[in-house]
Structure formats: structure tokens, C-alpha cells
Amino acid sequence: MSRSGSTLLARLLSEYSDIGVSLEADLPDGILHEGMHIESVDDIHAILDRLYSNAKFVAWNIGRKSLGEELLKTDFPIGFGGLLNVLLSEYFKKENPKILIYKCGEYIWHIDTLRKIFPDAKFIFILRDVRAVYNSQKAAYRSKDGKPMASYPIIAAALFNRLPLTIEKQPENDWLYVLKYEDLVSNGENEIIKLLYFLGSSTKKTRGDYYDRIPLEQKHLHANIRNPPQENRVRAWQYELTKTELVTIQNIAGDTLTRYGYELVETERLSFKEGIVYFMYWAKYLGRLIRKMAVKVSRFILPEAWYLWVEKHLSVYL
């Protein structure tokens, strides 16, 4: 989930010489974005055109010519697994760390698929109190359009409720590590040491600075990551969320919060005015679900040109 503390964790891990953590990018993974198999030289040119038309990937500062040459050295067909390995190798060519980490929080919902593509990979998930996540989201503005990352709390709470089904369905294993953000803030050194052991990394540090890799247009989202974690901000949500926001989140995700050791806060009964706001949250959420369903259904019943129009105009509101 956005604003869960993953950039702080990326900065802390990047301090170690064995580890390289990438920026996020909209890659053709066939999971979150349209996939693409590379089976010819023409496909390489097409994938390069696609990658270098994406601002997030351009921020990786990988030379197009160099990347093309590396892809030509790779056996066809090249799927997402092979492509990502080449991209990370090129991205960290100067540092040459032995552990390469691709940062993408949304992959938590697709672990089974990713395990098939990367059977030897390890996964790190950072868990944070959803009340704090939402509080941070509503104060942060997306770099692509300047809008708040969140404007009402139901989506954050609903996503948080999916975590037990996603995390706990995995059998006991040595490839998934769940780290609580609050533990990272309060006992960072010990938590990082445990994580290094999980990754098989040494404790040797480097002078690398993850903040320097972040594109200028995104730096405002991560202004504090160079500073030590602020323990006084861990529960700032308790004073900054409105009562309606707090009640909404706890009504939806209360069981999941307590399941992961987070205490619920007692609140007074909502006033009539606050109840109206609560109702509007649900009305807005229902409208969002209807629009999503309309986009999906139109794909099967409308001509392609009409579907693309519906997708373009309704997806703005999803």
C-alpha cells in the first residue's frame, strides 16, 4: 500500500553494499500492466519504445543503447522474468550488488503469480497501521496529477482487510518476510539485522544514498526519508484523522487491525453531520464500484472503439 513506509525501508537497505533497491516503474509485467513477450529483434525495439515512453522508467537513467545490447545477448523468448533481470542488472551496473530488489508494493496481491515467474525470489512486505497509512495518503499529493493519494478512507480499509487472505494463506516458508513499520521505527537496527539475515546479506555498509535516485518530481513525497524515523509520528493519525474517518476505518478493518496487534480507539457516537459524511463515503465508494464494473462489462459488449472511450472517461474516477 502507498505510504506504508517502503521508501524508508528501501533507504535503510540501500545503505548495505550487498543490496540494491530499485525505484518503482510501470513495467510490462503482465500483472499490473500489459505484458509483452520478446521473441525477435523487432520486439526488442518495440519494448524499448514502450519503456522509454514511461516517465517512471526513464527516471532509472538506463542508457537505451546499452539496454538494447543486453537484451540482444539474452536468449529468446524473453518474458518478464528475463526482462526484469536485465533491467536490474543494468540499473545497478556500477554498484554490482549481489542482492537486487525491485520495489513494487502492489505485488503483495500477486505473490502466487510472481512465485511462478521468480521461483527463487524472496519477498518483503512492510505492514503498517492502516489508520496511519490513510493519514499519510491524504496529506500526500500524486506527482502525475497533483491530486491527493486518498480522499476518503474506505478503499484503504478494504485493502487492509485483504492482507490476511494474502499473507496467511502462504504456508510457512523462508521466502516471505513481513516487517511491521512500527517495529522498524522503534527498533530499527535490530529489525534491519534480522532482515539482512533473511536476505543473506552481509552487514557491510556503503555510501549509497537512495534519496538521490528518486526523481525530482517525486522527492516531495519522501522529504523525510533522509532523517531518522520519527517515533512521534507513528500515532499522529490519532490526532489528525477526523472522527468520521476513524470510525469508518475501524468499522471496516477493526478485526484486521486487532489481528495484527493494533489497538482500536474508542470514539463517541457520530453526530448527525458526521453521519452524513459517513454516508457520503459509502455513496462515493459504491459509485466507484459501479464505474469499475461498467468498464469491465463494456469490454465484452461494446465495439473496441466504444470500450476505449468508456475506459478513458470512466477510469478517471476509479
Predicted regions span which residues?
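PAPS-dependent sulfotransferases, especially Golgi type II membrane carbohydrate sulfotransferases
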Residues: E168, S201-L318
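Anion-recognition interface
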Residues: H45-I62, G82, Y102-K103, I108-L114, ...
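P-loop (Walker A) phosphate-binding loop of NTP-binding proteins
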Residues: M1
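Short, flexible helix/strand-to-coil boundary loops that buttress conserved ligand/catalytic motifs
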Residues: L23, L32, Q137-K138, R207, ...
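PAPS-dependent sulfation machinery
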Residues: V21-Y102
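PAPS-dependent sulfotransferase catalytic domain
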Residues: P77-E90, K94, I108-W109, I117, ...
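A conserved segment at the C-terminal end of the G1
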Residues: T7-I19
